[in-house]
Amino acid sequence: MSSIEIESSDVIRLIEQFLKESNLHRTLAILQEETNVSLNTVDSIDGFCNEITSGNWDNVLKTVQSLKLPAKKLIDLYEHVIIELVELRELATARLVARQTDPMILLKQIDPDRFARLESLINRPYFDGQEVYGDVSKEKRRSVIAQTLSSEVHVVAPSRLLSLLGQSLKWQLHQGLLPPGTAIDLFRGKAAQKEQIEERYPTMMARSIKFSTKSYPESAVFSPDANYLVSGSKDGFIEVWNYMNGKLRKDLKYQAQDNLMMMDAAVRCISFSRDSEMLATGSIDGKIKVWKVETGDCLRRFDRAHTKGVCAVRFSKDNSHILSGGNDHVVRVHGMKSGKCLKEMRGHSSYITDVRYSDEGNHIISCSTDGSIRVWHGKSGECLSTFRVGSEDYPILNVIPIPKSDPPQMIVCNRSNTLYVVNISGQVVRTMTSGKREKGDFINCILSPKGEWAYAIAEDGVMYCFMVLSGTLETTLPVTERLPIGLAHHPHQNLIASYAEDGLLKLWTD
């Protein structure tokens, strides 16, 4: 990843803003003096201008004390303040401002005549507004001062230093560099770096989650930040689990109150947003809902996302769109803001089984039980290429881009005993096979976070573990005696979830 250069002056300004918001004004003044870097920010430019045009000079002068402004503009400001004080017959205050403020001391040095006229105005026993203001009214002068000073200041979002620190911690959590739910010693950086775990295939079951006798998980996924394991079940419930103990997350208020997220039909697919804050779910009745995981609130619903069941959902990189594929053979893009279908991509002749955005977000990849993979232009929706893998038109079940592969490659899982590593043009680079003919056809495939291992679950209830680089089958692991449905991989640990029609969601570790 290319390095990002940060100006030292910007870092100083972040500290200065923190000092200002913490009312550490003396420290702020010393830092500005020693570094010669000024903050020059106000909470609101409109508010700053309103203070000037309203003549709230106490607030104005307090604000400009922490700003670095051109001497001429400061002299004009202080001169006008003195004039208004004289008009109000606040003569003692006017003398104090004229004799003890830096802008007026500077004025006395560089323009003695102008300063003398100001002193004369203070000493007069009367105030003649017509003589002082002339054809330019007091209000007009205030407006001019407001306009000239506003061009020197900026508005910055509050608490930028704390916000950036929070964002950096969130990024480290997303990358697996911080353990979820752990208190962080920010200064000492005790948890700032976590040893990278060597990717290894699982060898044993850690725990299992049992569903009700009339239900079973149709889908499951870990959140990118590793905080959640979410399942979607045959009866429409969407549940958030603590994968460390296999219990329902009761720290989520809505689950503690038995007010679960729910759809009207079986939840066929689930996908998290990149920041792990939102969850998209698709059901067999053609509906999609988007949830806020922390609260369980439904943020957006697409009641007619597809005319038949929804088989796959994905968030766009910026969370502004939902990509979906359905049993109606159509790939669609839905707008989060509008709640409407923005784009349709037709061409598949059977069920859509998986949809993906390419890593850069410019392309959409879809696969279908018609045995084809299509690459679409992300903006126009035009089909750029169509290809198939293998010698037979086996139904393709899912495609997974291989992380950091150059040139880009992906793993294709179809209803056979072989996985295919292909490039974006569909050329087969490598194959991985179970070698089993009877009940050896794969149903679902996942990749480890770094792309070193591919795990495929077959009709026989066995998980096959392949090393991607060599394509060799390293080990097998029986995971269910009933019909398996799918797999999900933890984003940072050697932890895999398997789910099947036996009503068990099992967690496997090394």
Curated annotation (Swiss-Prot):
WD repeats: 212-251, 260-301, 303-344, 345-379, 380-423, 425-467, 470-509
Outcome following mutation: residue 18 to S/R: Disrupts homodimerization
Annotated CTLH domain residues: 41-93
Species per Swiss-Prot/TrEMBL record: Caenorhabditis elegans
Domain LisH per the UniProt entry, residue ranges: 7-39
Subcellular localization, as worded in the UniProt entry: Nucleus
Alphabetical UniProt keywords: mRNA processing, mRNA splicing, Nucleus, Repeat, Spliceosome, WD repeat
Pfam families for the chain: Beta-prop_VPS8, LisH_TPL, WD40
Family label: Belongs to the WD repeat SMU1 family.
Function of the protein: Involved in pre-mRNA splicing as a component of the spliceosome. Selectively regulates alternative splicing of unc-52 exon 17. Thus, smu-1 mutants selectively suppress the effects of unc-52 nonsense mutations in exon 17 by promoting the accumulation of unc-52 isoforms that lack exon 17 and enhance the effects of unc-52 mutations that affect the exon 16 splice donor site. In contrast, smu-1 mutants do not suppress unc-52 nonsense mutations in exon 18.
Reported tissue expression: Ubiquitous. Detected in the intestine and germline in adult hermaphrodites.
Name this polypeptide is given: Smu-1 suppressor of mec-8 and unc-52 protein
Stored InterPro entries: CTLH_C, G-protein_beta_WD-40_rep, LisH, SMU1, TPL_SMU1_LisH-like, WD40/YVTN_repeat-like_dom_sf, WD40_repeat_dom_sf, WD40_rpt
Ribonucleoprotein recorded as keyword: no
Gene responsible for this protein: smu-1
Stretches for region Required and sufficient for interaction with smu-2: 1-181
Comment, domains: The WD repeats assemble into a seven-bladed WD propeller.
GO molecular function, one term: identical protein binding
Gene Ontology biological process terms, A to Z: embryo development ending in birth or egg hatching; locomotion; mechanosensory behavior; mRNA splicing, via spliceosome; muscle organ morphogenesis; nematode larval development; neuron development; regulation of alternative mRNA splicing, via spliceosome
Cellular compartments per GO CC: nucleus; precatalytic spliceosome; U2-type precatalytic spliceosome
